[in-house]
């Protein structure tokens, strides 16, 4: 390679790096403005962190190409012009972030590297990272005089009149009368309960609701009319004293204790020595997070000794003596590598996104549902796109954003398959429906497999020990084709022992569970058949209304529509199901194999004793040994709806032994609590 060629190549590479920097700078600036100025962030904190880290990594790798207007050296953006602007006496810095135990160890190593041998391995103070708006409060001789937002870290906005309306902020501090200037910094936030009330009132009045408590708190403080802020449920949590701290107080933890004595609210905090102690406290707070009265998104770790804090100093944006240990992200960015189509038991085609594996909320996610073709069109998502994936608690991960400006060249729009990817039958998308379906029905192996899996599931025939893996294996080996074949597996016992190395004990347990499942209920049997549109509650209503299977199978569409929760479309689906010859053959084969149930005493569903009531079950039913599913079936037979969570609309809570938080919540809401002995009398089982 000649020198000219090498120079040209280097120049081209530099231009490519600069172009990427400019794109990231534009993105970070855009979201800085949305977050710090408008208080309407359009991406999650984690997505913002990832954009910023990408820019920092480029700048560290190519320092000579760092752009002069890079936002990595500043905290935020310009304050709003509608409030007067105030210069901070001491810059209000932001915090750096760490995300795992290795980051934590590295942070502590950096602290030690800047300390003398005698001062190394200092004690740390850990407190909650509150998710609100950072505010500085200033007092002159104990009198509150000014409240200012962080703004860009150097200049903030004067929100004094709004701050005065926050109930837990002391406006006069007698114990600070001898302190010329006292500056207290902290976070203004909106507790979860207040946030819910505020949004509920907004909905009732037809007003705009807030996306989250942080936006609600920030939006309330930015109101030009203090009366609006006064009407909002805001709270202030102090986290530092930046001017006026008595000389005798030399620790951050002691400063927080002093603030409490002055009348400020502070969050819980802990003093620790080692990285493992930090990690243990951090992990315990992840578990407690949902039960807190306010939102937190991590923990703040600070060197506890204030003298050492001064020695360690700060970078342009953040202190060296503190960092934010963020909780596992619930929204992260990754690459959508491909889109595949899966076929469900009713023939529904569901697009599934195959992701570059990524940690979301502490769990590795590699697949994400895209729901249906309409959702793909709405998102305008393509294979190769950068996407944001969200997962909260036990919620199934989903794509919440597609980064179209990061889309690589050469991608193509997703098209709906014309034929089933499994059986090659035509795919239809009925007019007015969002779900495309394979027309292969029982000809389609995917639908056959899903029907088998549904049939043995816990809420259907509840055949313990016959899991999805074995069912698919039996299906692929031709041993099981229809659900009725399950009850003839005993005829293949020897073959099953050698198949997939099941073993005699596993086969014996499986066959016993199959035999025990023959005694079932009509509602379970109806649900197990997998009729499209018939869920658990509808199956219960059908059983209660018709009493036995022959009456249901012979019902007209009009008769079916008379059943609660059964509309015209569902009635047609049920009617057609029982007129398909292969379905009749399977039902007959099941009954011939010994599947049976007790006839249900017919009742008009609107005359049931618990009709219109919503019940919740918690704890263990020890006296009867009854499972929650069986208790649920009894309650449904009496007309009740059974929910998984307690609310003000809950009619009663069935509480067994070791009832937990649901019982506490029910008692606080005044919900009727029914103990097991009363429940057994109610269902005639005592």
UniProtKB/Swiss-Prot annotation:
Gene Ontology biological-process annotations: DNA repair; DNA replication
Recorded superkingdom: Bacteria
UniProt entry keywords in alphabetical sequence: DNA damage, DNA repair, DNA replication, Ligase, Magnesium, Manganese, Metal-binding, NAD, Zinc
Binding positions (Zn(2+)): 420, 423, 438, 444
Gene3D superfamilies assigned to the protein according to its UniProt record, in alphabetical order: 5' to 3' exonuclease, C-terminal subdomain (1.10.150.20), 6.20.10.30, BRCT domain (3.40.50.10190), DNA ligase/mRNA capping enzyme (3.30.470.30), Helix hairpin bin (1.10.287.610), Nucleic acid-binding proteins (2.40.50.140)
Entry's Gene Ontology cellular component terms: cytosol
Binding site for NAD(+): 45-49, 94-95, 127, 150, 187, 302, 326
Catalytic activity as recorded in UniProt: NAD(+) + (deoxyribonucleotide)n-3'-hydroxyl + 5'-phospho-(deoxyribonucleotide)m = (deoxyribonucleotide)n+m + AMP + beta-nicotinamide D-nucleotide
InterPro entries per UniProt: BRCT_dom, BRCT_dom_sf, DisA/LigA_HHH, DNA_ligase, DNA_ligase_AS, DNA_ligase_CS, DNAligase_adenylation, DNAligase_N
Residue ranges constituting the BRCT domain according to the UniProt record: 605-686
Listed cofactors: Mg(2+); Mn(2+)
MF GO annotations: DNA binding; DNA ligase (NAD+) activity; metal ion binding
The keyword Manganese appears for this protein: yes
Active site feature: 129 (n6-amp-lysine intermediate)
Cited PROSITE patterns: BRCT, DNA_LIGASE_N1, DNA_LIGASE_N2
Family: Belongs to the NAD-dependent DNA ligase family. LigA subfamily.
Protein name, UniProt field: DNA ligase
Organism: Psychrobacter sp. (strain PRwf-1)
Gene expressing this chain: ligA
């Amino acid at each position: 390679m000649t020198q000219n060629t090498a120079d040209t190549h280097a120049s081209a590479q530099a231009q490519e790096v600069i172009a990427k920097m400019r794109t990231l700078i534009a993105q970070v600036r855009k979201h800085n403005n949305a977050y710090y100025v408008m208080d309407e962030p359009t991406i999650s904190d984690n997505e913002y962190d990832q954009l910023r880290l990408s820019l920092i990594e480029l700048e560290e790798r190519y320092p000579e190409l760092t752009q002069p207007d890079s936002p990595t050296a500043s905290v935020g953006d310009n304050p709003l012009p509608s409030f007067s602007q105030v210069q901070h006496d001491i810059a209000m810095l932001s915090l750096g972030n760490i995300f795992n135990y290795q980051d934590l160890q590295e942070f502590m190593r950096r602290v030690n590297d800047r300390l003398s041998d005698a001062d190394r391995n200092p004690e740390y103070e850990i407190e909650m990272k509150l998710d609100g708006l950072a505010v500085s409060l200033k007092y002159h001789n104990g009198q509150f005089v000014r409240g200012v937002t962080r703004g860009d870290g150097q200049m903030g906005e004067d929100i004094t009149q709004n701050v005065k309306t926050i109930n837990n902020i002391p406006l006069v501090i007698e114990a600070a009368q001898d302190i010329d200037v006292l500056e207290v910094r902290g976070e203004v936030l909106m507790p979860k309960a207040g946030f819910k009330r505020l949004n509920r009132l907004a909905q009732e009045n037809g007003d705009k609701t807030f996306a989250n408590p942080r936006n609600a708190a920030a939006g309330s403080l930015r109101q030009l009319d203090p009366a609006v802020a006064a009407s909002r449920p805001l709270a202030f949590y102090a986290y530092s004293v930046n001017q006026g701290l008595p000389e005798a107080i030399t620790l951050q933890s002691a400063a927080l204790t002093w603030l409490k004595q002055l009348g400020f609210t502070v969050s819980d905090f802990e003093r620790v020595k080692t990285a493992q102690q930090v990690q243990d406290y951090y992990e315990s707070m992840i578990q407690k997070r949902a039960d807190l009265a306010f939102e937190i998104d991590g923990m703040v770790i600070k060197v506890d000794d204030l003298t050492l804090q001064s020695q360690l100093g700060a970078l342009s944006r953040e202190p060296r003596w503190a960092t934010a240990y963020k909780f596992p992200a619930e929204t992260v960015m990754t690459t959508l590598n491909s889109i595949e189509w899966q076929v469900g038991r009713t023939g529904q085609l569901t697009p599934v996104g195959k992701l570059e594996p990524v940690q979301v909320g502490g769990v590795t996610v590699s697949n994400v549902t895209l729901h249906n073709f309409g959702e793909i069109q709405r998102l305008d998502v393509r294979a190769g796109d950068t996407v944001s994936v969200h997962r909260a608690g036990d919620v199934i991960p989903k794509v919440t954003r597609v980064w179209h400006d990061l889309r690589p060249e050469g991608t193509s729009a997703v098209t709906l398959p014309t034929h089933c990817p499994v059986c090659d039958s035509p795919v239809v998308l009925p007019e007015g429906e969002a779900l495309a379906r394979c027309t292969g029905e029982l000809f389609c192996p995917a639908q056959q497999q899903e029907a088998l899996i549904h049939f043995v599931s816990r809420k259907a025939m509840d055949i313990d020990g016959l899991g999805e893996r074995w069912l698919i294996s039996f299906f692929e080996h031709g041993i099981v084709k229809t659900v009725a074949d399950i009850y003839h597996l005993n005829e293949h016992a020897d073959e099953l022992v050698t198949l997939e190395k099941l073993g005699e004990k596993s086969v014996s347990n499986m066959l016993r569970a199959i035999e025990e499942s023959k005694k079932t209920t009509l509602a379970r049997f109806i649900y197990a058949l997998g009729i499209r549109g018939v869920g658990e509650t509808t199956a219960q209503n059908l059983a209660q209304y018709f009493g036995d299977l022959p009456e249901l199978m012979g019902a007209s569409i009009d008769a079916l529509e008379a059943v609660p929760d059964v509309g015209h479309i569902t009635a047609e689906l049920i009617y057609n199901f029982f007129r398909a010859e292969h379905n009749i053959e399977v039902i007959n084969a099941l009954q011939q194999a010994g599947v049976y149930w007790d006839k249900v005493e017919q009742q008009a569903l609107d005359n049931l004793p618990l009709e219109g009531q919503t019940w919740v079950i918690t704890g263990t039913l020890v006296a009867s040994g009854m499972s929650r599913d069986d208790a649920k079936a009894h309650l449904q037979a009496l007309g009740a709806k059974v929910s998984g969570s307690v609310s003000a609309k809950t009619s009663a809570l069935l509480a067994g032994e070791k009832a937990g938080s649901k019982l506490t919540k029910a008692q606080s809401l005044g919900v009727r609590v029914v103990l097991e002995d009363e429940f057994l009398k109610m269902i005639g089982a005592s």
